[in-house]
Amino acid sequence: KLSGGQKQCLCIARALTVEPKVLLLDEPCSALDVKASAKIEELLKNLKERYTIVIVTHNLAQAKRIADDVAFFQNGRLVETKDAETFWEKPECEETKEFLKG
């Protein structure tokens, strides 16, 4: 029987078999334990060298560890997009600032 993390890795591997240009992942580490989540994050860090990866997540800590660029959406509207460092350090839009405050 496969663990949640193993199932998630298998799903990602299966998606890669068709050699996509973009890999879209929706909450790839949700419902996984810390160890499995760390393995998925490491896999994604390695894959982003070869693929364009779009991750939809509410997990800001995870986004900080993985993302090169960030697009912030609120109520279905694109609010702000920046390289990750600038996004976390100097957001411009008030909605982004409020969201990042928690």
What are these language model-derived features?
Residues 1-2, 6:
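Conserved ABC ATPase signature
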Residues 23-26:
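Catalytic Walker B motif of ABC-type/P-loop ATPase nucleotide-binding domains
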Residues 34-36:
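Helix N-cap at the start of a conserved alpha-helix in ABC-type nucleotide-binding domains
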Residues 18, 49:
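Conserved signature/switch motifs of ABC ATPase nucleotide-binding domains
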Residues 63-65:
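A short, surface-exposed alpha-helical micro-motif characterized by mixed small hydrophobic
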Residues 51-56:
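Conserved H-loop
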